Amino acid sequence: MGDLAFTLHGARWYDGSEFIQPDEGNRYLLIDATVENKSDEGKTISSMMMFSVYDDEYRSADVAGGASSEIEGQLDGDLGAGRKMRGELPFEVPADSESFELVFEPDFLGFGQAIYEIRAEEIEG
């Protein structure tokens, strides 16, 4: 995707804690990924602006900010030239979905996107 490379490492379920719970019938899907800046200048990474998930009924889910305290690493902030950033992306999704599509759209103007399929049976937890 231009100057940014994306690697999907895996995904895991998170059911919440006493302080944060998904809505009834939902679960948190935490996606482990790396973004690499292949350019010679810094880039700003925004999980809220660059990533979304669609379930098997084509319903979209944005990054679930409420689950952010439970993730390992974040995909947000400045990413220097030639550097990598690894973290988890939290999404609140229907618990009964069998597959998901992760959409990575690094250009805010909509000039290209990468789509990754995640099957429920491949998700840890």
Features from the language model and the residues they span:
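Hydrophobic core residues within well-ordered beta-strands of beta-rich domains
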Residues: 4, 29-31, 85
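Beta-strand cores of secreted/periplasmic/IMS beta-sandwich domains, seen most often
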Residues: 28-41, 89-91
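Short strand-coil-strand connectors
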Residues: 1-2, 56, 105-109
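Short, solvent-exposed beta-strand/turn "edge" segments of beta-rich domains on protein surfaces
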Residues: 12-30, 41, 78-80
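The feature marks short-to-medium sequence segments in extracytoplasmic or secretory-pathway proteins
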Residues: 36-85, 112-124
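Surface-exposed coil/turn segments at beta-strand junctions on protein surfaces, enriched
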Residues: 24, 80-84, 93-95
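Membrane engagement elements in two modes
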Residues: 1-12, 22-24, 96-97, 115-125
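Short, surface-exposed ligand- or partner-binding patches at beta-edge/loop junctions that are enriched
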Residues: 86-117
